[in-house]
From Swiss-Prot:
Belongs to the peptidase M17 family. GO terms for biological process: proteolysis. Mn(2+) 2 binds at residues 266, 271, 290, 351. This is Probable cytosol aminopeptidase. One of its GO terms (molecular function) is manganese ion binding. Presumably involved in the processing and regular turnover of intracellular proteins. Catalyzes the removal of unsubstituted N-terminal amino acids from various peptides. NCBIfam families: PRK00913.1-2 (NF002073), PRK00913.1-4 (NF002074), PRK00913.2-3 (NF002076), PRK00913.3-5 (NF002083). The active site is at residues 278, 353. It comes from Trichodesmium erythraeum (strain IMS101). Its cofactor is Mn(2+). InterPro entries: Leucine_aapep/pepB, Macro_dom-like, Peptidase_M17_C, Peptidase_M17_leu_NH2_pept, Peptidase_M17_N.
Amino acid sequence: MEIKVGNIPQLKWAGDALAIGLFEDAIKLTEDAIELTEEMAELDEMLSGTLSELIKETEFKGKANSSVSTRVGIKTSIRKIIVVGLGKLEKFKLDSLRQAAATCGRLAKKERCKTLGISLPMCQDADSTAIAITEGIELALHQDNRFKSEPENLGPDLEKVELIGLAASDEAIAHARKICSGVIFARELVAAPANSCTPITMAETAQTLAKEFGLTLEILEKEDCEKLGMGAFLGVAQGSDLPPKFIHVTYKPEVTPRRKLAIVGKGLTFDSGGLNLKVSGSGIEMMKIDMGGAGTTFGTIKAIAQLKPDVEVHFISAVTENMVSGHAIHPGDFLTASNGKIIEVNNTDAEGRLTLADALVFAEKLGVDAIIDLATLTGACVVALGNDIAGLWSPNDNLAAEITAAAEKAGEKMWRMPLEEKYFEGLKAMHADMKNTGPRPGGAITAALFLKQFVKNTPWAHLDIAGPVWVDTENGYNNQGATGYGVRTLVNWILS
């Protein structure tokens, strides 16, 4: 699909479908007529009143993400007109554009259009507007048919999209498409079943990325991890027949980096719960998504490798399965992490934090300026914030503010949560330094406090993405399935 800036005025554009946006408060209906803006009135006149008739007959109100469409007369340069609601003007932001563009793209494809002109109002500046619209279109139209013997025939592909009347640069569109390639890469990793996405294939994927983009790659095998004392990670891994892979990919700019960062993604390619087996109704069949943090990490690798910022970034994932076997760790076992902390495993289904513990210790030893970890870590976070919002924990206000700003720009919802030190009392063990789980209340907070024990001095933040990593139904520019949540936030943070 080609996406480009169209310098042609709205009234002179020719193609299959023209999509326009209307604010909720901009439509004034009377019994006899509709009051339109000057530009809309000119378009309506060109279409012989089709636009005003469509709005009136459908009682279109301009509510966010609502849409209507109709064919127009054969004497015009377009076949169809699409009207998408932008909601209230005072709530209009970049993500409103993404949502509107997604609605336009899906409807144009449903209407079997091959060319689409999009005329939406500007937000912030022309390039930011172009980036948001491009992201909305690209992500909404992504289809993952890898595992279907006969992919559904969803109609012809949209071949060309023009952003009409927008003085944006081609570089802005290229920038957005590079980011989208990372989001889609993450989506497809997370959506793949556990017999397709394994620790071995994740390592192979890292090798492919490193080779394609000239990145530095280090893969630590089980023996290497043993030498580094990664007892927490290896304790989880010992129940699986598949070998664990500790993956470290480094992007280094050609110039002296202005900053060194680390991103750590939880990489459980399948989580059975271990001997604390997940029971019926627990969603065990969905535990392929427990490598969502690693999926986001890998997606960010792909985007950053193409964008080439002047920042050095280390991408780390301790990848394994959490399985049931005669070799699996027992509830009550003690594990020694690579910083010497001894952990009592009181629940084998709280394994992600064990793998992250050694990964965080490894990351800090690299001498980076800041660390972010991402993980589908707790159901408690989903209970607290729902399926759309990730939890953010950090003892560093500046880092938390940076991440929050990056997420706002990306339209990825996030909420800062407390690191209540008093709650660590619930993690204290009788004969070890700590347990891996605490009391049920505040479970997402105690999980973050557990991770905090493995970062000494480096600014650090933890993102619990258990909710937004997956959607069961189409939602905005996210299709049913894996969302690639976090890639755009991380890219914005790295570039900031």
